[in-house]
Amino acid sequence: MTPPSTRRLSIGIAFVLVTLSACEKAFVPVCKPVSERTGEAGCWITSDATIGQLPSQPIFWHIDSYPSRAEAEPAKGPRGTVVESLGKVWLLTIEIAGWRPAGGDRVAEIGPLPVTPGLSYAAQYMEAIFTPGMTAPAHRHPGSEAWYTLTGETCLETPDGKMVGRAGGAHVIVPGGPPMHLTATGTEIRRALVLILHDSTKPPTTAAPDWTPKGLCRN
């Protein structure tokens, strides 16, 4: 028979482990740095950029491609970031509507993005490659998320319903705050550039264990 003191110690250890596990889960990143890449499929962080305060005009995500990094870097403005992703060199810029860099090929202008005047922002850029059926766990962002989909289809469920982003279709922009659950749908591999434009004082992504999706993206 186990002595009461031993049982109490075991229960206490178990409680601490569960508490630690819950705390760790709340800050588990959905995406990993590209330096930790172990395969093609997944979500990989290509850059974390400081943006600072934004103009009071409507703000957009500008996407331009260049033949090489050497050509993209001189065109980069104060809110621009050059990344190599999905086999191309991209200049990704947070700016007002109608902004254009020197050279390159204009790919997309996504927005307007929901922003808060006076807030200091950071931009996390990612490369997402999901096979059909792959999901990202429930999570939330302290700022807007947007995708530029090159191939495939993605369904995103939030408490307000679902939205679908497809290559060649309307761009997906999700305001910060609400929890979300992402599923790669359709029959093609999803390849996308992803932006999280977030409050620079907060982590870009946190888990959302307090919310359970209804499975709307399975229908």
Model-inferred region functions:
Residues T135-H141, T158, T183-A184:
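Short histidine-centered beta-strand/loop micro-motifs
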